[in-house]
Amino acid sequence: MQLGLDFNLVEDLVAGVDEVGRGPLCGPVVTAAVILDPSRPILGLNDSKKLSEARREALFEEIREKALAWCIARAEVEEIDRLNILHATMLAMQRAVEGLSVIPRLALIDGNRCPKLAVPCAPVVKGDSQVPAIAAASILAKVSRDREMVELDRVYPGYGMAGHKGYPTAVHLEALSRLGPTPIHRRSFAPVRELLDVSVQ
């Protein structure tokens, strides 16, 4: 049985790029770019959403240790509200690729569109479950963002951020209507915007 993606698919100097956090009502959108080293296999790479939290945490450390190059980047809430979530995500992906210590010959982007990059790039739909470097990027981005949301839960208690990570769950929406938005809530997202509109009236 093949555990995770086949590491033989890893190509020289190909960066995988992915994002986490497009859907949440609060917090940054986090991206990562990873160039894997074909001579240093990492077993069990897969789409971060298909892995347990413990497995993601272990792989997070292994990827950072064994990858040829990696970079975690972000776009802040203010940028999301100013640019819109799609453009903010593209900006964060651009930052991740530009932050790599090794220039890739190709960047493979999870999804159906590419940011503007100085290197050739191609989109790969469902890339996080097909391309090992994109799977690695998805793990770095998710673990990094999840850890940050746990920290933000301590700063803004009562919203349950450590659990839902900012996504619009029933618990989050109820807390939002009861407590109002925090400075890290995305004012351009409908549930937050509607609350602010009501409070202005």
Swiss-Prot record:
It comes from the Bacteria. A divalent metal cation binds at D18, E19, D110. It is found in: Cytoplasm. Its cofactor is Mn(2+); Mg(2+). Residues 12-201 form the RNase H type-2 domain. It catalyses: Endonucleolytic cleavage to 5'-phosphomonoester. Transmembrane segments: none annotated. One of its GO terms (cellular component) is cytoplasm. GO terms for biological process: DNA replication, removal of RNA primer; mismatch repair. The keyword Metal-binding applies. HAMAP family: RNase_HII_B (MF_00052_B). This is Ribonuclease HII. The gene is rnhB.
